[in-house]
Amino acid sequence: MAKAKFERNKPHVNVGTIGHVDHGKTTLTAAIATVAAKTFGGEAKDYAAIDSAPEEKARGITINTSHIEYDTADRHYAHVDCPGHADYVKNMITGAAQMDGAILVVSATDGPMPQTREHILLSRQVGVPYIMVFMNKCDMVDDEELLELVEMEVRELLSDYDFPGDDTPIIKGSALEALNGKDGKYGEPAVIELLNTLDTYIPEPERDIDKPFLMPIEDVFSISGRGTVVTGRVESGIVKVGDEIEIVGIRDTQKTTCTGVEMFRKLLDEGRAGENCGVLLRGTKREDVQRGQVLAKPGSITPHTKFDAEVYVLSKEEGGRHTPFLNGYRPQFYFRTTDVTGAISLQEGTEMVMPGDNVEMSVELIHPIAMDKGLRFAIREGGRTVGAGVVANVKD
């Protein structure tokens, strides 16, 4: 059978289901796949296939995640669903499955529960830009007022974490009815409304190529008669010959100009997001640049030593520490291409952090690193990964 060609004619958007255990995330995921296939074409996935989430590794951490794809009239969606709460925490912190928007599933019979709050907080910390809500199991609630009460609670909770609670779309339905092909208001029509809302409420994400140029430096070479070449994979944007660029991180920021781009020993006029290339720098000495710095569009990113982070600490079974760590712990923080030592301050009331925990912390590095909110990092001790984190907030 010929392999189906991947059609790039529709915008691609990454989404996922979040919410408390047993509120119906996986049933909704199956219902979305089924209804989308029926309405817009494509193949349906059944509940069992989604629930038996395969293990994957991201930054040395084992995560169970299900990935499904579906189409709407205007877009192609990649959708992640995790079986367990710990998998969500790991997934969101490592960025294994980045989300352009999330569907928060809340059971109408329970209302918001502890993990509902925790997933909203995590979304805020790791930079999930949009959340919309599917109020599930509405077929099991007879009282209209109860539904309104749950809706109010959810809106308040979203507002508590700086999401626009009052303006968030909340769709009432029953994932099970939709999955079973029922066409009452809580069945298939509710899921079709959800799909239409995904299309309208979650904006098309900015593609990497349209963002400002950034390339983490992996290696530095000196080529006699030509100058200094740095190599790396372009993370975002485009660099063209003649562009002014900055070298950011570890030392004071320096300005330079790109005088050449090469890939596989061929000279090019530009390097684009996703490409591995060498960039020739005008007037820059080999000893002025090092691995761990980044090349960037001037003014687009700044170096910082202090930041707040959301961190997942590996369990002993995952190869992490066997013992807790305390305030003032000084591991290495691995950003992009290099390790930098930093000291950890825990939040008031947190004495220590156990392997397997997720925790908010403040960090002070010994060298500045080019960073923005949302940058992922690993925490290492003597070369082994003991944690994964994301910058939640840059200080100075």
From Swiss-Prot:
Q: Which gene encodes it?
A: tuf2
Source organism: Psychrobacter sp. (strain PRwf-1)
Region G5: what ranges? 174-176
Q: Which family does it belong to?
A: Belongs to the TRAFAC class translation factor GTPase superfamily. Classic translation factor GTPase family. EF-Tu/EF-1A subfamily.
* GO MF: GTP binding; GTPase activity; guanosine tetraphosphate binding; translation elongation factor activity
Entry GO terms, CC: cytosol
Q: What is this protein called?
A: Elongation factor Tu 2
- Using the UniProt annotation, give all residue ranges assigned to the region (G4): 136-139
Q: Which residues form the tr-type G domain?
A: 10-206
Q: Region G3: which residues?
A: 81-84
Annotated region (G1) at: 19-26
